[in-house]
Amino acid sequence: MQNQSKKCLFEVCANGVESCMAAQEGGADRVELCAGIPEGGTTPSYGEIKIARRMLNTTRLHVIIRPRGGDFLYTPLEVERMEEDIRMCRQLGVDGVVIRKVEFASLI
């Protein structure tokens, strides 16, 4: 078995296309694109994602999927919105999505 060293990835949180481009120019391996950073990060707009995907050619693009700030307890309607956002990201060729969800039962 060969000794394979694992490379550390350089990931940058970006709040828009401009930040994505700066991260790519700075050598980032991956960008996590999000809006609403003061709220803890929310899903960016369709246009922001589409343009970021087009502009990033050497850096992987991951998009946060979060319909709002606050807790991570989502209503069924919010989950449906998140599922649609994931489908949109897939159609746009995003490399991955970032999700956090807390189940109510896990709080007990």
What name fits each language-model region?
Residues 1-13, 54:
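N-terminal amphipathic alpha-helix/helix-capping segment at the start of soluble metabolic enzymes
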Residues 2-5, 28-36:
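Short, charged, low-hydrophobicity "junction" segments
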Residues 8-14, 31-33, 61-65, 97-99:
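Hydrophobic faces of well-ordered beta-strands that scaffold small-molecule active sites
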Residues 17-21, 25, 37-60, 76-80, ...:
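Active-site-adjacent beta->alpha loops and helix N-cap segments on the catalytic face
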Residues 69-74:
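A short acidic, helix-capping loop that chelates divalent metal ions and anchors anionic groups
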Residues 89:
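Residue-level signal for inorganic ion chemistry
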